[in-house]
Amino acid sequence: MRWEELEDALEVLETEREYDGYFCSIKDAVIIVILGSLCDLQSVKKIHAWATTAHVKTFLSETFGIKRIPCYWWLLSLLALVTPESLNQCMKQWVASLVPQLAAKLEKEEEEQSKKKNKKQPLTIAIDGKEIRSTGKMKKYDSPLHIVSAHIGELGLTLAQKTVESKSNEIPAVPKLIKALEISGCMVVTDALNCQRETAKAIVEAQADYLLSAKGNQKELMNDIEQYVQDEKLRATMDSVSRTEKGHGRIESRSAYTSGDVGWHPGGREWPALKCIGAVHTRFETSKGVTDEWHYYISSKVLTAEETASPCKNGMVGRIDALAFGCAL
């Protein structure tokens, strides 16, 4: 990995007020936090302990010229000076520079598998919102803030993130986030909250495809798909795949169904480029009993049951690293 690209991206960092860089620059502090986050360290305290180990100090010195590691409280103070918007822009720029390299590597690794399928699989972009719990106690906010993120499932990278002041504000924020990204040719997956016509429209206009989860907030849509899927004769005509997994004291059975037969649906004209409906049935068997769940989906692409099952099972929802961002708040 070329670390120069990270340093270049951080050149546009902005701060709430001026700082002379005495002892440790803000850029160095952010680099330490980013690298610690990549090592799956989930608090600034753990990152500081990691950064002060001998081999990490040597790496930081030789790679980035960071000669001094600030104490834990000083590291927090430096991060608090960073504006969230500029940090988000820096991360978007850095991740964008990495995507072509990682995508090429992924394509090479899956070359044999792709040959068998005779088609190239698109990258999956997951749109998801997470609550920043610590912000609920801050006087300037009536409720905890939320981060809406766009995550590349196959590469384990977050493309971009946007803060909103409540969960309901995620809905108008998602189309804006999508319009700011280059996602042409990708498959965009969202949770039920963001199964919205405006979101679907933004995805299609970005020349991408969507796979949206239909639940209670789109009750009529969910009920229509449910009636179709639960009709045994109609379900028998759908493409399907089933698998069973055992482990951790439970048996999980999963079945996926898809159909390109959407002409009957009255909302076909309302949902942009609607071409497919799908369902995933999950059954869990444990010592405590048996539970089962049905989840319903719509897509702008005619998908096989296998294609539907994969992103739905894995969720494709990546962890947003909010350490530096949360401190900046």
Residue locations for each model-derived region?
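Short acidic (Asp/Glu) and glycine-rich catalytic loops that position anionic groups and cofactors
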Residues: E11, H55-V56, E205, G289-W294, ...
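Dynamic "connector" segments at or just before major functional cores
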Residues: M1-A126, T135, S149-Q161, P175
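Domain-level cores of phosphate- or acyl-group-handling catalytic modules
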Residues: E165, I171, P175-G216
